[in-house]
């Protein structure tokens, strides 16, 4: 029996908990759920159009899949990256099944962009709302990468592993996303 099994669950690393969960410990898996459920739900909420119910269902799906495949967990693998990879794949499946991107692009083409004068100044809440709107208009691939890196605070290598693309591509897509955001929010400059 290794020493980390003697520590209280809250003091164990994610990897230690996942190793215990892979060996059959439901309490260790419950602790991982406690640590990640809120972040994953927030990720789904942003990615799936702000649908609270769909975000909650998708979060449960992530943990169900993780629980079902816990015995195949590769010891030493970053648990956060593993869970967000599952979440990312669920989002991709959701987009495919709903043809979400096609609808989004069609609606963007149909709605003319209205520009407000430069003197319009927004308070922090309004700027946050404007940013959320810009993010919702981004193609899913850019939105996923932005969300994983800036909102979920994952590193570039972690994002690259989750999305399955090279780190350089992640960096260039983040740069492209930031340029789009700056351009669309330029009207809100003082």
Where are these regions (language model features)?
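Arg/Lys-rich amphipathic alpha helix in sigma70-family domain 2
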Residues: 68-75, 85-105, 176
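Short, charged helix-capping/linker segments at alpha-helix termini
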Residues: 3-6, 22-31, 42-61, 167, ...
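Structural recognition of an alpha-helix C-terminal capping motif at a helix-to-coil junction
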Residues: 57-64, 77-89
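Helix-turn-helix DNA-binding module
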Residues: 133-136, 140-144, 148-169
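Internal acidic/polar
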Residues: 11, 93, 101-128
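Residues within the DNA-recognition helix of helix-turn-helix
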Residues: 36, 173-176, 180
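C-terminal edge and immediately downstream basic/flexible tail or linker adjoining helix-turn-helix-like DNA-binding
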Residues: 1-9, 20, 50, 103, ...
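Short helix-capping/turn signature of helix-turn-helix
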Residues: 35-38, 47-48, 147-154
